[in-house]
């Protein structure tokens, strides 16, 4: 089965979408029912691309995550149900940690539609899934086996899908060990040459068992260069240098190093006895973990060296006479035997010529070897090359396929070992060509990015295959665009690109490179003067990117956005955008047909734009509104005023400057006419932010509307009951006077207010169960009353609308006017009580901001009280905040709430660390802008010394240099005085093409004033830096950091230096040398110039999604919730199949599917399958997320459980040690997740008889569990029990007894005496007491007589069986099977309720009970519950058949 990786081939780019080549899953499996999924899930080793092929494929095969409301803590969302509008909605896919801030993905779900509409939609979508089964079969298609005969190799037989292209066979051959050295060949069937871009099913006479011949083709100049590049890639295949340097989408994975080979390897290549002693840095009590183990096995990574030098010769290009003899190019080679050769490439192949370094003699050497393959030629002239090449190939094919495929986007390492810099002509050529590596292969040279991006969006999307093709095209082009934009932005900052307005001040310059428009982040034309100057200009591109993301997610046909990427590099922010056709030839004023270019003074509208934006606005909850233009005429808009519409020369309708897509956040704006509520003013709001662009997140608006909808339904239901009761009374009592009726009809305002208050106080989750019933009741009531009393029915809805603050009087309507508080914009005010009433619109925006502080922040904290999936670092914390709709600028308020909760200490610590890192980032950006390129490494190392140490920090620069710096005002190319130059024609366009320009958001030495004054970096000291950090924390987050030196920060907040170093390096893109740093050094600075290895760009962009895969995934999840694991497994396998189809083999989303499939395999009893799938999930997470990413740690813990279940006991320990090391490195030992890992380690060590070690780990786990779950929690009971088991095996029965008593007490109080667990614990106590008494008697005997006299029975210490250890491991990790009958449901319900109440987690009770009750409603007789407590505290119930 060929892995689905998409090949990038030159000619494929001729069409607009540069990706004609698609690889489909080999689906011969489709016909064999369930086998299909295994084929999906167990790719075989030689199926992945590699070498240049991998690069090509990978490049085009970028991955994006679907716009999903990501599950912040990267746990399976398998058993969580999102409640939407009072009915059960789909659970959302876990996006596994998407880019740090802009890209927390969003489900563009229309939340406020009535429950009925949504229910209908859900039905429709599931119907759609079923109706498209036919398409899926078409996708799987049939498998075909063909034989391939190539010169000098055995005939090989391969299995292919009839939907694959002939090109796939090329890729396959270039990847196989025996044929990988060929690049220039064609394939023939009979005597016909096959077309590379034909699908196999269209090839005539191709049937099962046909033989395809490989025929060597003559070389051209281009083919010869491709061949040389391929050879170079094969030789450096094992070398991790590219991954450390962050090029070609290579990245690291260490799973194989840790497991010493493939876990599934049947041939016992791994040593049987694994040393189980934990390394020193893994045992409990480690303060600062070492850095070196982060990258294990660096020494042996490279593999043998085959050649000293392979480079293009200085005799190139061939002179005229030699061209006519067929010479294409000359190469120069130095072999390991120190022999020097000049090689000619001609159309027939490669031969050695007689040139030397001084004399050109292109005639063939004597004896002459002519080889079609350069590898063959080198093998004949160098025996060392031949042996080394074979070794490299063997090691390459032994590696897992996933280790060799390129990742979708570049993953950067924050630490790197000392790398050897080798001679590499191809690398040198790539660095200085402005091409993107493959450009010269593409007809028409540079790519028209805008055309490619828009054309792919226009592809048809009616059927499933069409949608897959469209999404694949969008994904590929987007991935290439991100790569190009990143490379261009670095070139711009490094000074390698000429500006389009070179005469202007360096801050005002704009650039075009490779058809991409670049602008720097400064407020160059006082465009943002009123909004916060450079600070506003710095954040604007990020808000613009948010806007582009949501409009892309809504995907309205006919509405176009620009390709947008925001890159932070060396302290500058660069915005890269695709170019609207014709924009550079026109003045901005002529271009804009919709919106305003001067913040609302002149406003235009356009009917087509109104129509398109109204469609999008429905999903985004944007209220169409009217504003007055300069002539006092009302102009209707369906977006913010800043949003501009430009019709390009291609006739497409583009929108740009989407920075105000969502309404402003009034808590951070000082506005005259806004009075915040008492609670908010007491908390210190409004806080004046340093720019006026703060807006609310889409997730917040959705949560707010959902909350209001639930209240609306409840209030309406209350009124209905009153009405019905009144009706019945009337029926009894006969008619009443109309007066009383009218009285009843308009209840005093106090009542509705009281109801509103009630509705706010009551927990909503439980209520939502009956919401659907309520909706139906209201509908029925309306239809019944339509005849009897329409007035009353309308009155019910009207009252409910008034109570929840709906925009419309008689219908539930929540939409937001993004311009409502914009200064200088004059609104057309509507009548009181209608949706166009400005007062109402303002009230709504205020309510949403208040909801964030009073509802969402407490909800966020309550969610984390259960510690079910706790954030591990700043990135997971940020995602979790974003999923709750909380902006990071509220971090100070979140920390304040956390500081009062001892059970949340770990989160308090992580939040403080994130705040310090972000504050430091702001300062670092201005600091870097004051640094000359010459002094970058000195400046960065000096900054790190000031941040992390108290030792000497003398900057390594001579006095003269410093003096020169002081006198020189222009510090840097991009950092000169601000000029008010009148814009040239092009610069006029930037604010429309590049909506905005940007600037360092940082505060400067003055803590928050203008950032135009660059900091002279040589003057910074540890004291001054920490004072700035404190000022920044107060100014930006309103949080008082009580530390003005690193030592105080470490003791006060419990953070570690390594965590701070990692967080900061990742945030700003620094790569430090991998070595052990002595932070306490008193004599020399901790960081020197040589410790700064590299600086990387930090890239923010949008991740395209795969909608059908997402639908399959969510349907699969709901099946799993109903306990239908097999169906769930099949649906999620199908989702993986589609993801492979769209994104290729490597992608975050694929990783989520793999983890879920592994979990399901394990639950279905197939531990071996679980191990195989989870191994791939680990490699994928390491490669796509990073080797020390929180989700990688999670994958390692899962893998250790499955490898234990497969009998790899020592191996599962090694995996847990790795997970624990990474976790402690990132967030320290004091974390609930460490308790889980320690319990696992302790159990396995116990199973191996290492009782002393086992005890150390379980004691640490117990300490953490007591701290975070409280003395009455189940986690604690289990820890006590594990401790008792270990102590009894050590013969310490007294301690064991005391610990088991604790367990018994907790079980008894939580579960009651009759519960099985309580009874087990009582039995355990009895046995322990018996053994303790025996031991005591023996001891007394010895004390009294000096020897044993009485004949006492021996004491039995039985080591636990592996089966019992596995059961216990399952329990700890939350995989627990319980049999419950229908009658037990009620008992379980009350038990769970009692247990969770004790821990104060009410909302979870409702979820847990709801899922039990729902499932038990569907099943009769016996049911089996899967209580999943480790990651998700949820209960699903499955019917036992």
UniProtKB/Swiss-Prot annotation:
Residues 1-79, 106-131, 726-769, 961-1009 are annotated as: Disordered. Residues 54-63, 964-977 have a biased composition (Basic residues). Residues 64-79, 106-126, 978-1009 have a biased composition (Low complexity). Keywords: Cytoplasm, Phosphoprotein, Repeat, TPR repeat. Residues 726-753 have a biased composition (Basic and acidic residues). Residues 8-22 have a biased composition (Polar residues). CDD domains: CLU-central (cd15466). The keyword Cytoplasm applies. InterPro entries: CLU-central, CLU_dom, CLU_N, CLU_prot, GSKIP_dom, GSKIP_dom_sf, TPR-like_helical_dom_sf. Its main location: cytoplasm. The modification Phosphoserine is found at residue 273. Residues 427-669 form the Clu domain. One of its GO terms (biological process) is ribosome localization. TPR repeats lie at residues 1109-1142, 1235-1268, 1270-1303. Belongs to the CLU family. PANTHER family: CLUSTERED MITOCHONDRIA PROTEIN HOMOLOG, EUKARYOTIC TRANSLATION INITIATION FACTOR 3 SUBUNIT EIF-3. mRNA-binding protein involved in proper cytoplasmic distribution of mitochondria. This is Protein clueless. The gene is clu.
């Amino acid at each position: 089965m060929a892995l689905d990786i998409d090949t990038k081939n030159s000619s494929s780019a001729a069409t607009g979408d540069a990706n004609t080549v698609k690889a489909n899953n080999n689906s011969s499996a489709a016909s064999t029912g369930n086998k299909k999924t295994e084929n999906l899930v167990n790719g075989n080793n030689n199926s992945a691309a590699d070498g240049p092929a991998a690069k090509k494929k990978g490049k085009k095969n970028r991955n994006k995550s679907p716009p999903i409301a990501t599950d912040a803590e990267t746990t399976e969302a398998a058993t969580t149900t999102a409640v939407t509008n009072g009915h059960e909605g789909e659970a959302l896919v876990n996006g596994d940690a998407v880019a740090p801030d802009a890209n927390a993905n969003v489900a563009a779900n229309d939340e406020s539609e009535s429950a009925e509409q949504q229910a209908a939609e859900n039905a429709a979508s599931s119907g759609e899934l079923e109706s498209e089964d036919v398409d899926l079969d078409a996708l799987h298609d049939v498998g075909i086996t063909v034989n391939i005969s190539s010169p000098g190799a055995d005939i090989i037989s391969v299995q292919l899908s009839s939907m694959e292209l002939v090109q796939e066979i090329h890729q396959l051959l270039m990847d196989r060990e025996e044929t990988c050295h060929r690049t220039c060949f064609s394939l023939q069937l009979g005597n016909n040459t096959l077309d590379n871009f034909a699908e196999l099913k269209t090839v005539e006479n191709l049937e099962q068992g046909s033989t395809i011949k490989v025929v060597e083709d003559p070389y051209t100049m281009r083919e010869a260069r491709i061949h040389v590049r391929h050879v170079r890639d094969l030789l450096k295949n094992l070398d991790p240098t590219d991954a450390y340097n962050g090029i070609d989408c290579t990245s690291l994975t260490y799973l194989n190093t840790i497991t010493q080979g493939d876990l599934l390897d049947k041939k016992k290549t791994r040593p049987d006895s694994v040393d189980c002693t934990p390394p020193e840095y893994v045992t409990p009590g480690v303060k600062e973990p070492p850095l070196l183990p982060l990258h294990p096995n660096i020494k042996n990574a490279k593999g043998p060296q085959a050649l000293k030098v392979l480079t293009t010769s200085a005799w190139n290009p061939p002179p005229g006479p030699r061209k006519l003899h067929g010479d294409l190019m000359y190469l120069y080679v130095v072999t390991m035997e120190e022999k020097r050769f000049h090689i000619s490439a001609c159309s027939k192949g490669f031969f050695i010529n007689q040139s030397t370094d001084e004399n050109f003699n292109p005639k063939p050497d004597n004896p002459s070897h002519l080889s079609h393959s350069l590898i063959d030629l080198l093998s004949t002239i160098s025996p060392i090359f031949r042996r080394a090449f074979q070794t490299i190939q063997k090691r390459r094919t032994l590696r897992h396929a996933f280790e060799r495929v390129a990742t979708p986007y570049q993953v950067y390492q924050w630490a790197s070992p000392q790398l050897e810099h080798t001679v590499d002509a191809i690398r040198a050529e790539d660095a200085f060509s402005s091409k993107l590596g493959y450009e010269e292969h593409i007809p028409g040279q540079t790519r028209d990015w805008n055309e490619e991006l828009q054309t792919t969006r226009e592809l048809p999307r009616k059927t499933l295959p069409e949608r897959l093709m469209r999404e694949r095209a969008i994904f590929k082009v987007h991935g290439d665009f991100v790569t190009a934009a990143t490379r261009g932005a670095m070139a711009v900052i490094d000074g390698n690109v000429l500006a389009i307005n070179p005469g202007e001040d360096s801050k005002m310059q704009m650039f075009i490179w490779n058809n991409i428009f670049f602008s720097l982040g400064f407020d160059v034309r006082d465009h943002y003067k009123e909004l916060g100057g450079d600070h506003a200009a710095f954040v604007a591109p990020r808000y613009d990117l948010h806007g582009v993301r949501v409009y892309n997610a809504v995907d309205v046909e006919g509405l176009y956005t620009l390709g947008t990427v925001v890159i932070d590099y060396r302290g500058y922010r660069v915005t890269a955008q695709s170019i609207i056709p014709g924009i550079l030839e026109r003045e901005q004023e002529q271009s804009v047909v919709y919106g305003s270019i001067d913040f609302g003074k002149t406003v235009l509208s356009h009917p087509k734009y109104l129509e398109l934006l109204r469609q999008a606005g429905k999903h985004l909850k944007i209220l169409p509104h009217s504003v007055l233009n300069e002539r006092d005429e009302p102009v209707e808009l369906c977006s913010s005023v800043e949003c501009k519409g430009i019709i390009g020369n291609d006739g497409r309708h583009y929108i740009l400057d989407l920075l105000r897509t969502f309404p402003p956040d009034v808590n951070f704006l000082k506005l005259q006419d806004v009075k915040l509520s008492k609670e908010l003013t007491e908390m210190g709001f409004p806080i004046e932010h340093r720019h006026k662009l703060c807006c609310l997140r889409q997730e917040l608006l959705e949560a707010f509307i959902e909350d209001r909808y639930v209240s609306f339904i409840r209030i309406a239901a209350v009124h209905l009951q009153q009405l019905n009761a009144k009706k019945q009374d009337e029926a009894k009592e006969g008619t009443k006077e109309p007066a009383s009726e009218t009285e009843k009809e308009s209840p005093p305002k106090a009542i509705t207010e009281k109801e509103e208050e009630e509705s706010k106080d009551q927990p909503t989750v439980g209520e939502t169960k009956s919401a659907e019933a309520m909706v139906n009741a209201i509908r029925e009531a309306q239809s019944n009353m339509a005849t009897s009393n329409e007035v009353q029915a309308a009155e019910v809805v009207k009252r409910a609308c008034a109570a929840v603050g709906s925009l419309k009087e008689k219908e539930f309507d929540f939409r937001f006017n993004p311009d409502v508080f914009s200064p200088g914009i004059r609104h057309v005010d509507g009548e009181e009580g209608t949706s166009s009433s400005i007062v109402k619109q303002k009230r709504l925006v205020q309510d949403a901001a208040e909801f964030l502080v009073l509802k969402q922040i407490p909800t966020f904290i309550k969610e984390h009280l259960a510690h079910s999936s706790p954030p591990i670092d700043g990135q997971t914390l940020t995602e979790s905040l974003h999923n709750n709709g909380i902006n990071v600028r509220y971090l100070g308020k979140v920390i304040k709430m956390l500081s009062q909760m001892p059970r949340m200490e770990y989160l308090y610590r992580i939040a403080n660390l994130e705040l310090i890192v972000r504050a430091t980032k702001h300062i670092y950006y201005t600091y870097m802008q004051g640094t000359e390129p010459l002094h970058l490494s000195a400046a960065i190392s000096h900054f790190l010394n000031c941040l992390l140490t108290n030792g000497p920090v003398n900057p390594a620069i001579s006095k003269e240099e410093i003096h020169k710096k002081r006198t020189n005002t222009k510090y840097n190319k991009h950092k000169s005085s601000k000029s008010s130059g009148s814009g040239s024609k092009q610069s006029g366009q930037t604010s429309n093409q590049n909506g905005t320009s940007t600037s360092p958001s940082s505060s400067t030495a003055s803590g928050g004033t203008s950032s135009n004054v660059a900091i002279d970096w040589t003057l910074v000291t540890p004291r001054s830096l920490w004072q700035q950090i404190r000022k920044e924390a107060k100014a930006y987050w309103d949080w008082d950091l009580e530390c003005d030196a690193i030592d105080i920060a470490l003791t006060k907040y419990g953070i570690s230096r390594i965590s701070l170093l990692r967080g900061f390096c990742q945030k700003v893109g620094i790569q430090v040398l991998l070595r052990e740093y002595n932070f306490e050094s008193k004599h020399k600075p901790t960081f020197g110039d040589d410790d700064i290895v590299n600086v990387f760009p930090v890239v923010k962009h949008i991740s395209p999604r795969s909608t059908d895969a997402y639908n399959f995934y969510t349907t699969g999840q709901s099946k799993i919730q109903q306990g239908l694991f097999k169906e769930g497994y099949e649906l999620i396998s199908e989702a993986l199949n589609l993801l492979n189809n769209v994104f290729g083999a490597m992608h975050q989303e694929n990783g989520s599917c793999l983890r879920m499939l592994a979990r399901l395999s394990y639950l279905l009893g197939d531990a071996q399958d679980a191990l195989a799938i989870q191994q791939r999930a680990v490699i994928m997470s390491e490669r796509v997320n990073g080797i020390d990413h929180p989700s990688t740690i999670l994958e390692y813990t899962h893998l250790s459980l499955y490898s234990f279940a497969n009998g790899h006991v020592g191996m599962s320990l090694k995996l847990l040690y790795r997970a624990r090391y990474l976790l402690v490195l990132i967030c320290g030992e004091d974390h609930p997740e460490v308790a889980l890992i320690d319990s696992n380690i302790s159990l396995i060590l116990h199973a191996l008889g290492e009782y002393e070690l086992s005890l150390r780990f379980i004691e640490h786990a117990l300490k953490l569990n007591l701290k975070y779950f409280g003395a009455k929690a189940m986690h604690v009971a289990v820890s006590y029990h594990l401790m008792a088991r270990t102590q009894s095996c050590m013969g310490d029965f007294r301690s064991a007894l005391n610990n088991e008593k604790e367990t018994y007490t907790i079980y008894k109080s939580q579960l009651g005496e009759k519960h099985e667990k309580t009874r087990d614990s009582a039995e355990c106590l009895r046995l322990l007491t018996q053994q303790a008494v025996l031991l005591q008697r023996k001891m007394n005997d010895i004390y009294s007589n000096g020897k044993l006299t009485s004949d006492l029975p021996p004491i039995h210490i039985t080591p636990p069986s592996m089966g019992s250890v596995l059961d216990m491991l399952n329990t700890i990790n939350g995989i627990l099977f319980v049999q419950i009958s229908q009658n037990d449901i009620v008992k379980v319900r009350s038990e769970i309720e009692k247990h969770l109440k004790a821990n104060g987690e009410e909302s979870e009770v409702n979820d847990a009970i709801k899922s039990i009750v729902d499932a038990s409603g569907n099943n009769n007789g016996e049911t089996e519950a899967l209580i999943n407590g480790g990651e998700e505290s949820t209960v699903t119930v499955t019917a036992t058949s």
